[in-house]
Amino acid sequence: MRCATRRPLFPTLKDGEDGAVFMGLIAFLKRLFLGTPAPSSDREKQSSGTSRPADFDTHSPQGAAPPESHVLPFPSDRKRFRVPHLLRYSAKVGKKRVWLRITRELPYRFARPNIASSEEYGDLSDDHNADALERFGLPVLRTPDELAQWLGLSLGRVAWLTGRFFENERPQSEQEAHYHFHWVKKKTAGYRLIEAPKVLLKAVQTQILRGILDLVPAHPAAHGFVKHRSIRSNAAPHVGSAWVLKLDLTNFYPSVPFSRVVAIFRSLGYCREVAIWLGRLTTSAIPSNLNSPDGMANTVWPYRSRHLPQGAPTSPALANLSAFSLDVRLNGMAAKYGARYTRYADDLTLSGPGKSIPALKEIIPFAEWIVRNERFTTNKSKRRVLRRHQQQTVTGIVVNEKLTLSRAEFDQLKAILTNCIRHGGTSQNRAGHADFRSHLRGRIEHFLSVNRERGEKLRVLFEQIDWDR
């Protein structure tokens, strides 16, 4: 009986083919792990290089036309997008890695002992970036002593405010903490922790805000808590759009950890020691015995590690700087589709023309991928896509054809003012506002800032109210 010839598992290579096979294997592994697309022709092989793909130019104009196919490859098919170093708040200052300098003499008070030897100290004060500090006009602070002198306090008092004397790096009770804690019920579900600094710490944080953080510009797309910007400027770029995509960041302030705050101050040019002290002065660690009102561990969990406190004067500015890279990337992505992007605190908004509607199926996951890559999370239940036939609202302002407030809100406030004229000014204070008159005046001023015509009608009614009745 004749047996069939068995084929070898690996074919025999001719001379010169072994090198080509090896290089092909290397190229396959590179595509597998790095996501680099394989060139389809010799011309593409020759033109391919190591430069950044043109699709990710973050400086493209807002009005740039979208790609012809309205489609960008999914992020996993290309190299990771990286923001230029000067635009990205990083823990490294400059390109050279700075090593810890060990000395036997105490370089400054409260210097940390070396782990290897208790007779030596680590000097973290010799790596400040004078050029970066000068660029923003920031005060030069090289040691904790200089920081305390700038704050007008003794070094011991500043060290006490940083919480370095707390057991296990956190206060054991609310009385020992430097913050007042108050739980507020959210509009949808759950609770939010408000952490208001006590008098001395609030004064220190206010000086850090005025003397350092206010001198550092936020990204142009950030409109929340930025001078000369408001909810109106945040909504204006989206007027007349065919679609509006609204995303919400979950636990925006608690998701900014202590390490990220230190990295912000390092990127501004401060040495590691001063950046750590500034980071501890502007972050919070909740007491060990603090419980949530609903008794759920998940409610307290986001606040367990040291984080940005909602209620501190420095938190909005630091939150904007922590999201700087997020703003750069989302703004660049929107520009590639001919869309627009703005952010007001934790509210992200993208909008675009009708020709970019087919790309929505990729814009949404792409934007959420960027958010996750920047170590934030989105609230899926608050994600909205509003078309032209719907009422498109951005931070409470209707943007379908022009900037205005909703008709329902106008009618409600008009009815309250009319009843105040008929029955007296305090008769309609059903919510129990401490100063109902100022409350109504503030709502009317809000209307005047957005829609002056409707605001004037409300103002005329307000002036007819008899507040002595």
Regions found by a protein language model. Name each.
Residues 14-18, 45:
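Intrinsically disordered, low-complexity polyampholyte segments enriched for Lys and acidic residues
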Residues 346-353:
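Short beta-strand->loop micro-motif that forms the acidic, two-metal-ion catalytic signature
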Residues 247-249:
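Residues immediately flanking
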Residues 340-344:
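Short beta-strand
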Residues 22-184, 193, 197-215, 220-243, ...:
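Right-hand nucleic-acid polymerase module
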